[in-house]
Amino acid sequence: MERVDHLADERNKAEFNVDDMKIVWAGSRHAFDVSNRMSRLVANDPVFEKSKRAVMSRKELFKNTLRKSVHAWKLINELRLSDEEGLKLRSFMDQPGFLDLHWGMFVPAIKGQGTEQQQQKWLSLATKMQIIGCYAQTELGHGSNVQGLETTATFDPKTDQFIIHSPTQTSSKWWPGGLGKVSTHAVIYARLITNGKDHGVHGFIVQLRSLDDHSPLPGITVGDIGMKFGNGAYNSMDNGFLMFDHFRIPRDQMLMRLSKVTREGKYVASDVPRQLVYGTMVYVRQSIVSNASTALARAVCIATRYSAVRRQFGSHDGGIETQVINYKTQQNRLFPLLASAYAFRFVGEWLKWLYTDVTKRLEASDFATLPEAHACTAGLKSMTTSATSDGIEECRKLCGGHGYLWCSGLPELFAVYVPACTYEGDNVVLQLQVARFLMKTVSQLGSGKAPSGTTAYMGRAKHLLQCSSGVRNARDWLNPGMVLEAFEARALRMAVTCANNLSKFENQEQGFSELLADLVEAATAHCQLIVVSKFIAKVEGDIEGKGVKKQLKNLCYIYALYLLHKHLGDFLSTNSVTPEQASLANQQLRSLYSQVRPNAVALVDAFDYTDQYLGSVLGRYDGNVYPKLFEEALKDPLNDSVVPDGYREYIRPLIKQRFRSAKL
């Protein structure tokens, strides 16, 4: 049967070359080729089929994840895929599982904190999957406050061993993915105690389960923490708990690149700078920002295609109804999210460069840019994951009632993504780290030390504190210099106001505590400035492809002007813009929506997502939504029979019951 493209008319409206935009989205021709090949490899492999996840029991879902994970590993080896290809294949598998933590946390922890000898021993096993590892830091009682971890590792010089112990219930490791049922080993974090002195939290490699029968080793209590949010979602992952009862490990299983304990029990810091640990943190947070763009793009793709298919109202004579995407209310909610997906993609590209730059500097013992890089990645992780989780939920609502169906793909996507707001750093706590960095930077203004990197704008504090926006008409809001100055003035003035208010407190920590909400807002303003500036830098550079640059410019200014609209209180209260200029920004925003409208479907086609990866009836490439909704409904186990189980037990007795007439 010939496939009908219900979105063909939408695609014919495009004013740019979609294939060229695909290259820009991917980052390069090579990156696109890898992504395209791996996505189609997964889409065409029946083992990776995922439409039945919603009706699986927890045990069935978990076993299904094991099957897919092992199959992915076999493919990587049989096809001799590169690390880049393997990473892409696992991402398109689209099912959280133990491989994510093994490759994403366990292996990098050993690379970053293990000595050369430790890396040779453990990585040779881990990279061949002869051991399976996880990363056990978070405890039941402590997450963000790493220094408050309670698990202890006490050195016993008599046996040359560390005694790992969980002294309280709240000291049990809680949440690590892969821990509950799969991992044979873990990098665990515990308080290092030797000769009665607590040296703080350090990392250790600990075997948890037998390599013969997978049973937990004596002294270890381990299991799954139970069902999480959503139906399938992260319930495919065995997030676990772990308690130690005076469990002994050899001394050489302490990760000793940064510090070590001698045979006699002496604690010795190595000459390797401790700041190297932050390199791994920058890498992890950079990848989280890139993943934010991917997740938001999936939701936006679904909502955009469905908004073009769905028709409601607008017909007064029995004619065809209006496409939902043509309503300005829909555009005002949808197009800023489309712009955000592209914005996060490009700031993610920049963060990859930043990670490479920081790594080179660290290897040369140059730590000058590290505080700024740490604050920047912390803030962008927080900002992008919060915006993405909110954006996915907004896309669900943009799809109306059908967005609530599991087969829309949006409830599952939201349930899988929303933990990003708390893992690898709670988003509010991370913004407070940014705020501390900003307060320090403001305090150094005028000292002769010029701010650099993402805070370079603060070096123009005198101008930015006094300037007025030069916007005179709506088109001025397409001037990159004027847009940037408005965002710079807002960010600087909010930071300076916080610093001035802090100076009124005799106790700085008390002041910081009192001003937490204001500080978070100042940090958010700074991070939004970073994203806007990197988006502008991207679209002002060389971009190949017919019409591509124009479309990206439209999205760039939609992103910036919508942020201005959303946070108008900040811009007005800091006098960064006037009410009249804000009105002109809204006028320009409406014009940009009209320019994006004919290109909307093509702009989400540029993400190059297969129907299998999207996992959405509403977001199908061909737009054939309604027949497929019926097909999905009929697949539900409740429709296996026309009369439901329980009819004779409950329904029939209920409707056949007899009531005696009341006597008057």
Swiss-Prot record:
Its subcellular locations are:
Peroxisome
One Gene Ontology MF term: acyl-CoA oxidase activity
Q: Does the keyword Coiled coil apply?
A: no
Enumerate the UniProt keywords alphabetically. FAD, Fatty acid metabolism, Flavoprotein, Lipid metabolism, Oxidoreductase, Peroxisome
Q: Where does the chain bind FAD? A: 399-404
Q: Where is this motif: Microbody targeting signal?
A: 662-664
Top EC class for this record: oxidoreductase
- The reply to whether Oxidoreductase figures as a keyword in the UniProt entry is yes
Cofactor(s) the protein requires to work: FAD
Q: What is this protein called?
A: Putative peroxisomal acyl-coenzyme A oxidase 1.2
- This protein's species is Arabidopsis thaliana (Mouse-ear cress)
